[in-house]
Amino acid sequence: MKLGVFTPVFGTLKLDEVLVKVRRLEHVQALELGTGGWPGSDHIDLSALLDKKPCVAEYRQKIADAGLSISALSCHSNPLHPDAATARAADDVFRKSVRLAEQLEVPVVVTFSGCPGDSEGATRPNWVTAPWPPEFLDILDWQWEKKAIPYWQDAAQFAGDHGVKVALEAHPGFIVYNVDSALRLRKAVGPNLGVNFDPSHLFWQGVDVPAAIRALGDAIFHFHAKDVAIDPHNVAVNGVIDTKTYRRMAERSWLFRSVGWGHDELEWKRIVSALRLSGYDYVMSIEHEDALASVDEGLQAAVDMLSRVILTEPPVQAWWT
């Protein structure tokens, strides 16, 4: 297992500057690159690289010369959006990201499952969170059977044809937001579709993260190291479903934090142990979205914590059995 960094945090920097900065972060060995959608594409240009072998080779070499690898290409967006143009744009960046991942020899593309509307005439997504009134269940059935499953059957097949795995980040607001929904879609689509496991979206739902990791097992294709802090006072008053903007930090029930600032070192040791028990031995990619810390301070805090808990060497053979 090794540490990586998700690059949107360096959106104001050029790639060469990013490489210099990351090389100074001891223990970090990989980059997760945004290729479009919500992460943006500040450090890799799909159109400039795709199907241009010399450019692809030069880009790969630049990353390698910095002592780094690329863990994933990430294009988080909503390919199920009821607005056709929005959905087409999301699908286009996903497919281009898959093709470029193949050419860069990157094994996985990360995105969201997306969320449809409630009918063919919808213009905005509709995330259903309750089984009652009963029409909500009708909406859910339609979303899954008519939109999510058909789209991802085709998209995962496309990725598989290019030797690339699809890792969906379980995120509230989308069809896949927890273990149950992730496994439901994987069962319908096939083993080339799995999960980008981000504990920050599960902690505040009340999920025991190590238990969720064990439940997903080999469906975990990539991992985001990001923490969340629960505000006990605000939760006591309003619960955990919170639509306040992230700028209203003091009023929110939870906030994204640097690793270690939401959950302690023991909890992250439990997470690393669960990943190893589940067979995951790839990258823990640090995603910095802590509005209370600077980029440098927040990233360093995450690296310091994770470098103490990550297991980088193969496990011992149990001679005591």
Where are the language model's segments positioned?
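Active-site acidic/histidine proton-transfer and metal-coordination neighborhood
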Residues: E17, E58, K62-D65, P79-G194, ...
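A short acidic, glycine-rich active-site loop
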Residues: I44-C55, P133-P150, R248-D264
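Flexible loop residues that form catalytic
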Residues: G36, N78, G114, V228, ...
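Aromatic- and acidic-residue-enriched segments that line the glycan-binding/catalytic groove
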Residues: S47-L50, G117-W132, V235-K244
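Short beta-strand segments at enzyme active-site cores
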Residues: L31-L33, I70-S74, P107-G114, V166-E169, ...
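Short, basic/glycine-rich phosphate-binding loops at helix/coil junctions
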Residues: I70-A72, V128-P131, R248-E251
